[in-house]
Structures are given as C-alpha cells and as structure tokens.
Design a protein with these regions (language model features):
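Conserved catalytic core of the tyrosine transesterase superfamily
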Residues: 1-354
Length: 354
C-alpha cells in the first residue's frame, strides 16, 4: 500500500521539535526566545541538545545559587547575578551530579559542550541588551585531550566482512537470525567501510537514493545539505544483492519513499539497531577496540588518506566543513609509519660510522 508521508529527515525534525516544545515547559520562559533567535543557523538536533544542556544548567542554579526558586521562576535578572565563579562551580559540579533520580558524570568533552551552550545563551541575551553582563566569556574551556583514532586494520576489515557473511563466532541467539539478515548486514558494513558514510546518513537512505548507473548515492548532510557520494563496484555489488533480496520478499511494504535498510519488522532501521549490529560483529573481530559506526568511518578516512595523501579530498568526501577537523584526525603519522621507523634510530653504532 502506498504511503504518502514526509521523508525520514522531515519526520526526525518534527520529532525533535515536539520534544523541544515539551521540554521548554520545564525551562524559564526566556529559553523559548533564545531558541527562536538561533533557529535559522542551527538544526533541530542542535537546539534539542541546547535544551538538554540548559535543563541541567538551570537545575544547578535552582539547587545551588537561587535556592527557593523553581526553574520556571528564574528570570533574566537572575542571569545578571551569575558570576564567572558560578560557571566554574557548575563545570566542577558536572563531574558528579544528580539529575532527577539519576547520578551522572560528564567528561571534559561533555563539560565543554555544556559550557558552549550556556555561553551561546548568555551571548544572545547580552547582544540583545536584555542582560547587562556576560561572565561566561571569562571562563576557560575545559582542556580536551586529543584521542588517537580507533580504526580497523586492513586484515580486520576482511575478517569483519567474512564474519558477517559466514556468521562465525556469533552467539546461538544471533546465529538464529543470521541467514535472514546477513545480506542486509553485509550491505550496511560494506557501505560504511567503502564510503565513510555517517550513521544518520545511512539510516536516512531510500531506495531511490541509489544510482547504479553512476555508482553514486545522495545523502543529507548535517545542516540539511545534500551531497553525492560515489562507491566502488564492491559496494555496488553488496547493495544490489540486498535490493534483489528485498525485491523478492513479499513482506516488504510498498511505500514511498521506500527506506533502503529495513529492520526485522520491515520498518526503516533505526540508529540504535545499526549501532547494535556493528557492535555484534565487531566485538568478535576486535573486542578491545570497541568499534562503532563512527570508527568504521574513521577506518575509511584513514584508508583514503593513505591512498591519496590529499587531506582536502578526505575532508570533502567525509563532509567536513573545516579541513582542520580532517587534518587533526587523519594527517598524523599512521601506526604503520610509527612501526616502520621504530628501528631507524640506532643507539649502538659501530665506531667507524661516526
């Protein structure tokens, strides 16, 4: 049966907006003004994350600085009383805090994101002349330690794809579903490893997104922009095999747009399902690396940089707006290079070499 509905991204945005509207009822009235002010330059997901961060910040103010005031009672005048010391105490508080009935903890990266949200709000109202001071600018951003790229080696990539194809190492429970899902799972993992696609982009693909005549497909990038990505024959073969399986399955619903990847319930596969799928196979191949879809993207980015040596191509294909983001992750000396130079410096040289 045909289904006339908004596409995946429109549906996702509507869900985000509904969630934002619901959460705004817990926040001070002026938060709605802030979100409206940044609407044209932010995605719905960014604004939803702003709301999550602000809930924690105002809960902190209500508990620690403005005792006796509920979150809804906090005013812009109260923001004028927030000092840089208060913000620093907030960042320290995030190391071990209670929110609702949960005990939570933020690492430095999460603290930096929450500080960025609070800064954005204060800057917005300060620039509008609605508050007199913006002390958030005086607070140093938590220092972030560079994380080494976690990726699969070439041999591990081959083993991973073999594991998907043959099901070796799977639990008895997972093995029971393997015959039904292995063609789909092979297509998903091959697409990750062969194109560097983001998980949100993969989940949002429709049948019509794929153009086999040009070995290409259209993705919706962060911010809603569209981009054309290209794939190899190996990726194309995996996609074609999955589409053929779907074509011959009478349970596949007739709907428009038709989601490319389906769950066992014949609905568009979810981000969580893809994360679990990757985890299921990757822990067999490389249990210590904790491979995620994003790390499969890193695997592709590393391989592409090795092959081309061109950081700009890698940035373009991965959809990085700032090439410095790419350079930071992929232009470092690779593990193989480190190994190859390990014996270049000799501590004991024959006398005649000096």
């Amino acid at each position: 049966m045909k289904k006339n509905s908004a596409d995946y991204y429109q549906e996702r945005n509507l869900k985000n907006l509904d969630r934002i509207d619901s959460l705004l009822e817990e926040l001070p009235f002026f938060c709605e003004d802030f979100l409206r002010g940044v609407e044209t330059r932010t995605s719905t997901l960014t604004r939803l994350n702003y709301v999550y961060d602000l809930r924690i910040f105002f809960d902190f103010l209500s508990r620690r600085k403005l005792r006796g005031k509920s979150i809804r009672e906090i005013t812009l005048d109260d923001l004028n009383e927030v000092t840089d010391t208060d913000i620093e105490i907030f960042l320290s508080y995030l190391s071990n805090y209670r929110f609702g009935d949960k005990r939570l903890s933020c690492d430095e990266r999460a603290k930096a994101r929450k500080l960025s949200t609070v800064r954005s709000m204060f800057k917005y109202f300060f620039n509008k002349g609605l508050i007199d001071v913006n002390n958030t600018a005086k607070v140093a951003t938590p220092k972030l330690h560079e994380k080494e790229i976690v990726r699969l080696e070439n041999s591990e990539v081959s083993t991973l794809l073999d594991t998907v194809e043959y099901g070796s190492g799977l639990s008895d429970h997972a093995s029971g579903y393997h015959d039904k899902t292995k063609i789909r799972d092979t297509a998903i993992l091959t697409l990750f490893l062969g194109t560097g696609i983001r998980i949100s982009e993969l989940v949002g693909l429709n049948n019509e997104s794929i153009d086999f005549s040009n070995n290409s497909f259209i993705v919706t990038r962060k911010g809603g922009n569209h981009a054309i990505l290209y794939f190899s024959d190996e990726v194309g073969d995996a996609l074609a095999a999955y589409l053929e399986q779907k074509k011959n399955d009478p349970k596949v619903p007739d709907e428009e747009p038709a989601p490319l990847f389906l769950s066992m319930q014949y609905r568009r596969i979810t981000v969580r399902a893809v994360e679990n799928l990757v985890k299921k196979y990757a822990k067999i191949v490389s249990p210590l690396k904790k491979i995620t879809p994003h790390k499969l993207r890193s695997t592709y980015g590393t391989a592409l940089y090795r092959e081309t040596g061109d950081i700009y191509i890698v940035a373009d294909v991965l959809g990085h707006k700032d090439v410095n983001t790419t350079r930071k992750h992929y232009a470092a000396i690779t593990e193989d290079n480190r190994r190859s130079v390990a014996d270049k410096v000799r501590l004991h040289r024959p006398i005649d070499e000096d």
